[in-house]
């Protein structure tokens, strides 16, 4: 085993996580076949039972990581109750993973409105037609609701439902993982005690 097999190179020298994440995401956009911005989102219900599902990251900056959803959905209700969540990105083509967790805030209305307007018209209709996470009688019932809202909003802009908006995870920890031979992977974690605090960098055993 050579020294090169035990070290990854440059990413462990990063001084803060957001620029590094941006670099990794851009590389994933070139190599991943589908949805490089897909991420597993973990929440917890009132009984402490965890739930996980895939969502799409719609933005990130030094404030945090943003996704949008129906606030009356299971994930919406769980986040509103706990104000905490975790994410895990896995880019198989690059053999990389990024995990993060922290408190969650609701994005400002103006930010949610801007994103909602950018969505395809059919997706905006769907936000009205789908009672997300609730029992559905049949596919026909969903398609009927879509047809009704399509007729209702046949002309003009489609307003954003009050129950549909975005969440921003403000991470207290972000871990970067890169696959290495013999399971001697590289792990680099950034930690802070508060959403606006300074980052501490820690290299972790695989």
Curated annotation (Swiss-Prot):
Q: Which residues bind FMN?
A: 53-58, 68-69, 75, 97, 132-133, 177, 187
Q: Which domain of life is it from?
A: Bacteria
One Pfam match: PNP_phzG_C
Q: Name one GO biological process term.
A: pyridoxine biosynthetic process
What pathway or pathways are given for this protein in its record? Cofactor metabolism; pyridoxal 5'-phosphate salvage; pyridoxal 5'-phosphate from pyridoxamine 5'-phosphate: step 1/1; Cofactor metabolism; pyridoxal 5'-phosphate salvage; pyridoxal 5'-phosphate from pyridoxine 5'-phosphate: step 1/1
Name the cofactor(s) required for activity, per the record: FMN
Quote the catalytic activity from the record: pyridoxamine 5'-phosphate + O2 + H2O = pyridoxal 5'-phosphate + H2O2 + NH4(+); pyridoxine 5'-phosphate + O2 = pyridoxal 5'-phosphate + H2O2
MF terms from GO for this chain are:
FMN binding; pyridoxamine phosphate oxidase activity
EC numbers on record: 1.4.3.5
Q: How is the cofactor bound?
A: Binds 1 FMN per subunit.
Positions bound to substrate: 58, 115, 119, 123, 183-185
Keywords assigned: Flavoprotein, FMN, Oxidoreductase, Pyridoxine biosynthesis
HAMAP family annotated for this entry? PdxH (MF_01629)
Oligomer status and interactors:
Homodimer.
Q: Which family does it belong to?
A: Belongs to the pyridoxamine 5'-phosphate oxidase family.
The function of this protein is: Catalyzes the oxidation of either pyridoxine 5'-phosphate (PNP) or pyridoxamine 5'-phosphate (PMP) into pyridoxal 5'-phosphate (PLP).
What is the name listed in the Swiss-Prot or TrEMBL entry for this protein? Pyridoxine/pyridoxamine 5'-phosphate oxidase
């Amino acid at each position: 085993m050579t020294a090169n097999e035990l070290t990854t190179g440059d990413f462990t020298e990063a001084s803060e996580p957001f620029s590094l994440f941006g670099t990794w995401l851009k590389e994933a956009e070139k190599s991943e076949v589908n949805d490089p911005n897909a991420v597993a989102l973990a929440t917890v219900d009132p009984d402490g039972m965890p739930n996980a599902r895939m969502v799409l990251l719609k933005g990130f900056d030094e404030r945090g990581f943003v996704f949008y959803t129906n606030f009356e959905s299971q994930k919406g209700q769980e986040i509103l109750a706990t104000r905490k969540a975790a994410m895990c990105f896995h880019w198989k083509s690059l053999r990389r993973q990024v995990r993060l967790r922290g408190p969650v805030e609701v994005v400002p209305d103006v930010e949610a409105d801007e994103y909602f307007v950018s969505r395809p018209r059919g997706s905006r209709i769907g936000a009205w037609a789908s009672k997300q996470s609730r029992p559905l009688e049949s596919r026909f019932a969903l398609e009927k609701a879509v047809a009704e809202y399509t007729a209702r909003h046949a002309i003009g802009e489609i307003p954003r439902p009050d129950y549909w908006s975005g969440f921003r995870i403000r991470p207290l920890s972000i871990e970067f993982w890169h696959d290495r031979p013999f399971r001697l992977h590289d792990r680099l974690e950034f930690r802070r005690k508060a959403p606006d605090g300074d980052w501490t960098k820690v290299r972790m055993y695989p």
